[in-house]
Amino acid sequence: MAGHSQFKNIMHRKGRQDAMRSKLFSKLAREITVSAKMGLPDPNMNARLRAAILAARAENMPKDNIERAIKKAAGADGENYDEIRYEGYGPGGVAVIVEALTDNRNRTASEVRSFFTKSGGNLAETGAVSFMFDRVGAIEFAAEKADADAMMEAAIDAGADDVTSSEHGHEVICAAESLAEVQRALEAKFGEPKKAALVWRPQNTVAVDDETGEKLLRLVENLEDNDDVQNVTANFELSDALLAKLNAE
């Protein structure tokens, strides 16, 4: 299992979640505004906007905040954000992809580079590590929506490539270009998903020792705490012992 999938629940452990909630809402609103600006402000006609709204709802972002972010896209004096992807190597040579929405490229690049350097890694050129990942569609449903067999059957019928089911829910993986089609088919059967978005999926993962794993987690936390960073993906795998320790904290 990819490192980021392993620790995404750890990142929301008690204390951290409350501390990040206001910052998270700001990031979600930024993605909604940018998505609405890039296409129509109607989520039924704009797949990216729909995905952004789904992500906001999954985090219990108030409806008023969502609507305000959409309306902001129509404002003539609204901020303009650039989409930037940074790629680099973290501790242990682990590949890391950082996606950002920024109104100041120089500031964000400097801050991201600093995080990599302080962790013992280094920021590289665009394209340096992305070839180690596949760009795919990911659709997440709550566990109670269906049992594993029903979800697998429906997903394959809809054209998906893979399904992972656990007590935490179902994750359906499909080709990037098939995301909207697969999502519609599964929504018709199971209702609205928790999440539907394009993601980076590691082709292979790297096992790291516990010391390196903790350094990588700190790097990811620092990156995700940055106001401009939207997503962080890495290709490492944590040991069961470290996962158990972190989950107990």
Swiss-Prot record:
Biological process terms in GO annotation: regulation of DNA-templated transcription
InterPro entries documented for this protein: Integrase-like_N, TACO1_YebC-like_2nd/3rd_dom, TACO1_YebC_N, Transcrip_reg_TACO1-like, Transcrip_reg_TACO1-like_dom3, YebC-like
Subcellular location(s) of the protein: Cytoplasm
Family: Belongs to the TACO1 family.
Example of a GO MF term: DNA binding
The organism of origin for this protein: Xanthobacter autotrophicus (strain ATCC BAA-1158 / Py2)
Gene3D superfamilies xref list: 1.10.10.200, 3.30.70.980
UniProt-recorded name of the protein: Probable transcriptional regulatory protein Xaut_3062
Keywords carried by this UniProt record: Cytoplasm, DNA-binding, Transcription, Transcription regulation
Statement: the UniProt record of this protein carries the keyword DNA-binding: yes
Domain of life: Bacteria
UniProt keyword Repeat present: no
NCBIfam families: PRK00110.1, PRK12378.1, YebC/PmpR family DNA-binding transcriptional regulator
The organism's taxonomic lineage, starting at the top: Bacteria, Pseudomonadati, Pseudomonadota, Alphaproteobacteria, Hyphomicrobiales
CC annotations in GO: cytosol
